[in-house]
Design a protein with these regions (language model features):
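A short SAM/SAH-binding and catalytic strip from SAM-dependent methyltransferases
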Residues: 108-123
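A short glycine-rich, Lys/Arg-flanked "PGG" loop and its adjoining helix->strand segment in the class I
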Residues: 123-138
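Acceptor-substrate binding/catalytic loop of class I
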Residues: 143, 147-156, 181-196
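Short alpha-helix
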Residues: 177, 188-212
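Class I SAM-dependent methyltransferase SAM/SAH-binding core
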Residues: 47-49, 53-100
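A short acidic, Gly/Pro-enriched loop at the edge of an enzyme's catalytic core
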Residues: 98-110
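Conserved class I S-adenosyl-L-methionine
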Residues: 1-41, 55-59, 80, 84, 139-176
Length: 243
């Protein structure tokens, strides 16, 4: 069964207090780089996989998309999206992205923010996206970096005084399920290598345009713990085009 942690009331409440949940795209440390990878939305049909609060759906509409479909497994996420970002041309649909069925060539742009590392069968999803996109269509997504997902618990190693020593990277080439800790709770994620992310895209007809390991923006460097984000990559951004 696909995990839906975000409909747990206590977990969702903690998520809602995160900086990015409160401040949206401008509160996301990778947004300044992710935005650079996005294509022109003018007149485009856009699909957002794992749309969450709908921030990216609203962004696409503000940039003159013709139609936006935002899908998410979480009822609570979509309720918030509809409250914050309702629009006649934005449709929100509750479904796991792995279960989504759409007509071939039905979208011009597909994007996804920090959701694909929750997907067990990445290759099957890439196949579906290639089918849904028109020729020349764009797929842009962010995931947790393979360095960040490899070990599992996603926490630093500390000394006896609680000072950070280093970040563990282990079992890198053993892809598959990890029991991560997020918001003090155990969450299932799926680790895969950088090679798998990129080669799978090329195998299914995508041309790689950009690969970015985003650094935190300067204006966030004084936030608690942000300087430590320079010690290892946390996120990976990829932009490709269907050829």
């Amino acid at each position: 069964m696909k995990e839906n942690k975000y409909d747990d009331e206590a977990f969702f409440e903690k998520y809602s207090q995160m900086y990015r949940s409160i401040y949206g795209l401008q509160g996301s440390g990778e947004w300044h780089e992710f935005e650079k990878l996005l294509p022109d939305f003018q007149g485009k049909r856009v699909l957002d996989l794992g749309c969450g609060y709908g921030w990216h759906c609203q962004y696409a509409m503000e940039h003159h998309a013709q139609y936006v479909l935002g899908v998410d497994i979480s009822k609570r996420m979509l309720e918030t999206a509809k409250q914050k970002h309702a629009h006649l041309q934005i449709e929100y649909r509750q479904i796991a992205m792995e279960d989504l069925t759409l007509e071939p060539d039905s979208f011009d742009v597909v994007f996804s923010s920090l959701a694909l590392h929750y997907v067990k069968d990445y290759e099957q999803l890439v196949q579906h996206i290639a089918n849904w996109l028109t020729k020349g269509g764009n797929f842009v997504f962010s995931v947790e970096h393979p360095v960040f997902t490899s070990y599992g618990n996603q926490d630093w190693y500390y000394d006896e005084n609680g000072n950070i020593l280093h970040f563990p990277v282990d079992r890198y080439f053993y892809e598959g399920q990890r029991e991560a800790v997020f918001l003090q709770e155990e969450v299932v994620k799926y680790h895969r290598t950088l090679t798998t992310y990129l080669e799978t895209l090329m195998k299914h007809g995508f041309m790689i345009q950009h690969v970015v390991e985003p650094q935190p923006p300067l204006e966030m460097m004084n936030m608690d713990g942000m300087k430590d984000e320079m010690r290892r990559p946390m996120m990976l951004l990829i932009a490709v085009q269907k050829v």
